[in-house]
Amino acid sequence: MLLDDKILDIFGFFRNAIEERIRAVWSGDNIPESLFKRIIVGPPAQPKHGDLYTNAALILGKFDKKNPMELASTLCNAFENIEGIESINVVAPGFINFHCVNSVWHGVVRNINKLGREYGRTDLGHNKKVNIEFVSANPTGPLHIGHARGAVFGDVLSNLLKWVGYDVIKEYYVNDAGSQVKTLVSSVFLRYKEALGEEITIGAGLYPGEYLKPIARDLVEKYGSDLLNASDKDEIIRSFTLSSMLNLIKEDLALLGVEHDVFVSESDLQNRNVIEECVKYLRERGIIYEGVLEKPKREDELSEWQPRVQMLFKSTEFGDDSDRALQKEDGTWSYFAGDIGYHFHKISRGFDSMIMTLGFDHKGYVSRLKAAVAALSNGKASIDIKLYNLVNFLENGTPVKMSKRKGEFLTVRDVIDEVGRDVARFMMLTRRNDVVLDFDFAKAREESKDSQIFYIQYAHARIRSIVRRCPELLAIEKIDFSCVITEQELSLLRLLSRWPSVIKTSAENYEPHTIAFYLIEVAEAFHALWGCGNSDPSMRFIVEGDLHTTSARIYIAIAVSHVIASGLDIFSITPSEEMR
């Protein structure tokens, strides 16, 4: 059986083959597994160096205290019989480059056409449960556009992990027990009076947003003026307003294509004494004590510090830089106590793998949350906290004012109205999540290469167009892909062969933006190959009078469309069948 008939992940195959032969060469020595994790097998930065390379000689040279160039020569001898390798060469300071026979890349076309959109899918997760908490914005107003980046990141990461075999729960933590909710209730009551015809003045510290007016009108419609003197008006307004605000947030998220599986209420956890249970559990394990915190060195933590005896969590025993207070001076639970109780609740629900997204301004919470999860689970559970940075909104390079009028900000609805859901989702993933993102509305609206999602969709639509124009193809089993020999064609096939590795790496590192980068690269490579046909008719996808070459190239195009469609599916973006 030929290699091209059985290998679905080319780079995975070569990595395994190279690692196997390294172990054979060092059969008498114990090479630490950590070294193998540092060995790279992948495409070189410059295609002229070969189809793939490895840094194995450099990594193992340090371990074995041998000259990397000499070690590389030894390894070359061991690698010579790897199936699919045409030639091997060594370059300083010890890199090993490989050139593959063309049939390796031809096999990629066959396999993608056989698997369709399933190409690249793996069972990396083995159905392991993962809890991904994201957005969790305070229910005091509609979603600010700053939340959209975290929403899209969390949603696409959830899709990606599901795609590789994880059992994912998408969760939203409703912060409905803090002082901001009391302020919200006071603000709505004021608007309620206004809806009844009273003149009002919005005091300092209250929420002035126009979005509260419909809630106030709904209260009037349901209760008339009865709430003005009702003893339980605060609880009625609180319950009604939080329900309304949560529905508003869900509607905004739906505009982005985001839907959570579970909403967990902070006040519900408090009413069920979850924090008390958590504190009892930690106290029994000797992880809580009464003491005075040292004065913090960090400026941003000074406002929370008080030189008094209080209930403290031994956070430093679990990697944090300071122990943490669990109660305020008035005896109520601290913000951190609420967080630690919430994660106690997650663990009690059977989650030992958790992911959480936070705005970059919350980076100080990372170490304390990791410490909390380690303490609560006795080191058996883990939490990964992904920080997302700011979004700068621009119009032709000029900053867009975030504040449109008093109390109102650029919202998710505003952005979706401007560019549409698919464009907004993709744009949010065109940079690493922890890097500031420039979102230019003018570029997003363009139907050109400057709009990356348009360029990707255009590639998919072009392919669907040529497939419709050429319905009669030879069966792929009958095609000899040896006619596919130009560098432009082969480089596109090499790129497609990377898709399984891109998926695996993106999922392992929780970095969905790498899929966006890859899809852009695939679209560019396809359009470049298409462009070759403009100057050279023999390079066109449909070659008049040559059904064999035409079929081979259209199967390549179909392979491209499957990969693009798979990537867009992970982004919850519908691939375009035609451009209008």
Curated annotation (Swiss-Prot):
The record's keywords, sorted A to Z, are:
Aminoacyl-tRNA synthetase, ATP-binding, Cytoplasm, Ligase, Nucleotide-binding, Protein biosynthesis
EC number(s) stated in the UniProt entry for this protein:
6.1.1.19
Record's catalysed reaction(s): tRNA(Arg) + L-arginine + ATP = L-arginyl-tRNA(Arg) + AMP + diphosphate
A single GO cellular-component term on record: cytoplasm
Motif segment ('HIGH' region)? 137-147
The answer to keyword Ligase applying to this record is yes
UniProt entry tagged with the keyword GTP-binding: no
Provide the protein's localization.
Cytoplasm
Its GO biological process terms?
Answer: arginyl-tRNA aminoacylation
The terms under GO molecular function for this entry are: arginine-tRNA ligase activity; ATP binding
The record's principal subcellular location, in a coarse class, is cytoplasm
Superkingdom in the source lineage: Bacteria
PROSITE patterns, per the entry = AA_TRNA_LIGASE_I
Q: How does it assemble?
A: Monomer.
Name the NCBIfam families on file. argS (TIGR00456)
As for family, the record states: Belongs to the class-I aminoacyl-tRNA synthetase family.
This protein is called what?
Arginine--tRNA ligase
Question: Which taxonomic lineage does the organism of this UniProt entry have?
Answer: Bacteria, Pseudomonadati, Pseudomonadota, Alphaproteobacteria, Rickettsiales
